[in-house]
Regions:
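Acidic, serine/threonine-rich low-complexity disordered tracts
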Residues: 31-119, 163-285
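Bacterial N-terminal signal peptides
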Residues: 13-24
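N-terminal secretory signal peptides that target proteins for export/translocation
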Residues: 1-10
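Short, hydrophobic/amphipathic alpha-helical patches that form generic packing surfaces
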Residues: 21, 151-160
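N-terminal signal peptide c-region/cleavage motif recognized by signal peptidases
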Residues: 26-28
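Residue-level preference for alpha-helix termini and adjacent loops
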Residues: 24, 73-76, 147
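Internal, conserved structured core segments that host functional sites
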Residues: 108-152
Length: 285
C-alpha cells in the first residue's frame, strides 16, 4: 500500500496490507466512489512515516495511487519516499488489474517496478535494479505470473452478496499476489469485530482479519525476515468500507516485530461520490 522503505512494513505496503480476492463473488454492484485517505506508520509506538492513498472506483474501471515518506528518526538515518499506482477494469463488481507501477527511494537508492497484466496474467514486467543473484533464491517461473493480481489492487476487496459489508465474510478470502520481485499468497480469516474513529472521516465498525503469509517464488527461504513472516500468527488487517461500493480496504495493519509492532493506521478516511478519474503513474508497458 503506502511505500515506506522498511523490511516488514514495505512487505505489507506491497503485500498486505498489502490483499487480492479469490472469494466467490456474486452479481455486479453499482460502484461510484472516491476514497481520500491518509495514514501514519509506527514502529514500537514511534512515528516513522506518513502516507496518502486515493482510490477512484467506478462501475467499469478504477484507479488507485499512493505516496509515502519516512519521518522522525527513520528520516534522519535512512530517509525514504515512494509512490505506487494501479489501474484496471471492474468486472461483475470485481477489480481486475491491468497495470501497476511503484518507485521507492531510500538511502540514495531507487527501486522501480512496472507490471502489465492481462486477464490475471503478467504479460510484461520490469524491475530496477534486478534482484541479486543467489543460488538459494526460488526462481520466478511463467506459471508464477498467472492467476495473480498486483499488491495495490489486492487491497481493494469486494464482498459478495447484498448483506452487511462489516461481517465475518469480509475476511474469508485468499490472495495470489505478484509484486515484480516475489510471488506470494495471503490467506485471511475472521478474528473479531472492532470500532474505529478516524481524525477525519469514517467512524464505525471494522472487521479484523488474521493474515498468513506464504512465499512461493522470488524469495530466499533461509533469509531471516522470510522465516519470521511465515511463522507469524499475529498479523492483523482491519477492514473498513468504501461507502457507495461493496469494497472494503485496509484501515489498519499490524505486524509484530522484535522491536515492537509495525502499524499502519488511517488518520483520515473520507469516501465521497466519484468525480473525475484519479490520475496514476501506472501505465501499459
Amino acid at each position: 500500500m503506502l511505500p515506506i522503505r522498511l523490511r516488514l512494513p514495505r512487505l505489507f505496503q506491497s503485500t498486505l496490507v498489502s490483499l487480492s480476492l479469490v472469494a466467490g463473488l456474486s452479481g455486479p454492484a453499482l460502484a461510484q466512489a472516491k476514497l481520500d485517505a491518509k495514514y501514519t506508520a509506527y514502529l514500537g509506538g514511534v512515528t516513522i512515516g506518513r502516507g496518502a492513498w486515493v482510490i477512484d472506483y467506478r462501475d467499469d474501471q478504477y484507479t488507485a495511487a499512493a505516496s509515502g515518506m519516512a519521518t522522525g528518526l527513520l528520516k534522519m538515518f535512512a530517509g525514504g519516499t515512494g509512490t505506487s499506482a494501479s489501474r484496471g477494469s471492474v468486472s461483475n463488481g470485481q477489480p481486475v488489474s491491468r497495470a501497476y507501477a511503484a518507485t521507492i527511494t531510500a538511502s540514495k537508492k531507487k527501486d522501480e517496478v512496472e507490471l502489465a497484466i492481462e486477464n490475471g496474467a503478467v504479460k510484461d514486467y520490469t524491475v530496477k535494479p534486478p534482484s541479486p543473484e543467489d543460488p538459494e533464491r526460488i526462481p520466478i517461473k511463467e506459471n508464477d505470473r498467472k492467476g495473480v493480481t498486483d499488491p495495490m489492487t489486492a487491497s481493494l476487496m469486494r464482498v459478495g452478496g447484498n448483506g452487511d459489508l462489516m461481517a465475518p465474510e469480509a475476511c474469508q478470502r485468499s490472495s495470489a499476489i505478484f509484486d515484480g520481485r516475489m510471488r506470494y499468497d495471503l490467506k485471511m480469516s475472521f478474528k473479531r469485530m472492532d470500532k474505529v474513529k478516524a481524525e477525519k472521516g469514517y467512524q464505525g465498525p471494522v472487521v479484523v482479519c488474521a493474515v498468513h503469509f506464504t512465499p512461493l517464488a522470488g524469495h530466499i527461504p533461509t533469509r531471516p525476515v522470510i522465516k519470521y513472516l511465515v511463522a507469524l500468527q499475529d498479523i492483523e488487517v482491519w477492514l473498513a468500507p468504501v461507502t457507495g461500493t461493496r469494497i472494503v480496504v485496509p484501515y489498519r495493519i499490524s505486524v509484530p516485530t522484535p522491536v515492537g509492532d509495525a502499524v499502519l493506521e488511517a488518520t483520515q478516511f473520507i469516501a465521497s461520490p466519484a468525480s473525475k478519474a484519479t490520475p496514476t503513474s501506472a501505465k501499459a508497458l
